A protein has these predicted regions:
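Beta-strand-rich interaction surfaces with strong enrichment in secreted/lumenal proteins
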Residues: 88-94, 157-164, 211
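Glycine-centered tight beta-turn/hairpin loop motif at sheet-sheet or coil-to-beta transitions
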Residues: 9-11, 31-33, 128, 190
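Carbohydrate-binding surfaces in secreted/extracellular proteins
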Residues: 102-104, 164-198
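SH3/SH3-like beta-barrel fold
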Residues: 6-8, 25-31, 38
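Secretory/extracellular carbohydrate-interaction modules
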Residues: 83-152
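Short, aromatic/His-centered strand-loop micro-motif at the edge of beta-sheets
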Residues: 148-171
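Flexible glycan-contacting loops in extracellular carbohydrate-active proteins
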Residues: 193-211
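Extracellular carbohydrate-recognition regions
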Residues: 8-11, 35-81, 85, 92-101, ...
Length: 211
């Protein structure tokens, strides 16, 4: 299992194991090469991963394992990318249990709206009866809602994303601390918003969906 997360100034990143660090180079191993070295000058950050860290999913490589909603033509897979061509739900059970980091690249044309329920059990439909947290992402802002069966919906706050008004592709990263009931959103490695659910972590599912 990897123990460090290494980021480089050119945007590349790798998970691996640290072998050594001297005044000029960082030495590490990865699953695809026994040992690699890189000059320290190209290194942006090196972070040690928490104990028990594991990679649940890397992809996509196909539609296998993904659940589609009522309109199976709303989503399709092509060349390593999931493409939305209509209004529909796409979900997958990732076996989320503890804290997590969810990362994906998002590209769009024109105006768009994307809802990302996390820690949800509703994978093929949009369901307000499923205990989850829902990120509402559009050009320029993001909002987070807590959805809890029997308690309704509560808006936890909104963050501004001005760079999404001038771009059509960004890297999205969601960091979720289940124990502290805290959630963070990063766009292109920059913190957009941090939320905390004062009532504790309410979501009970283990999947993620896109709508």
């Amino acid at each position: 299992e990897p123990t460090v997360h290494i980021r480089f100034h050119n945007g590349d990143e790798v998970l691996g194991n640290l072998i050594g660090l001297d005044t000029q180079n960082v030495h590490f191993s990865t699953w695809f090469n026994e040992q690699l070295s890189a000059p320290r000058g190209v290194l942006q950050s090196l972070a040690f991963l928490s104990p028990g860290f594991r990679i649940l999913y890397e992809g996509p490589t196909s539609m296998n394992g993904w659940q589609l909603g009522r309109d199976p033509k709303a989503w399709k897979y092509r060349d390593g990318v999931l493409i939305s061509e209509g209004v529909g739900v796409l979900g997958r059970n990732f076996d989320l249990q503890g804290s997590s980091r969810i990362e994906f690249d998002l590209q769009w044309n024109g105006t768009f709206s994307l809802i990302v329920p996390v820690y949800t059990s509703s994978l093929d439909r949009f369901d307000y009866r499923s205990n989850s947290y829902m990120f509402y992402i559009s050009r320029g802002y993001v909002s987070l809602q807590r959805v809890q069966s029997g308690a309704g919906v509560r808006n936890l706050g909104q963050g501004q994303i001005p760079k999404m008004q001038t771009k059509n592709r960004v890297n999205v990263e969601l960091r979720i601390n289940k124990e502290k009931a805290e959630m963070e959103m990063y766009i292109d490695r920059e913190l957009v918003k941090k939320w905390r659910d004062a009532n504790g972590f309410a979501a009970t599912g283990s999947g993620i969906s896109f709508f």
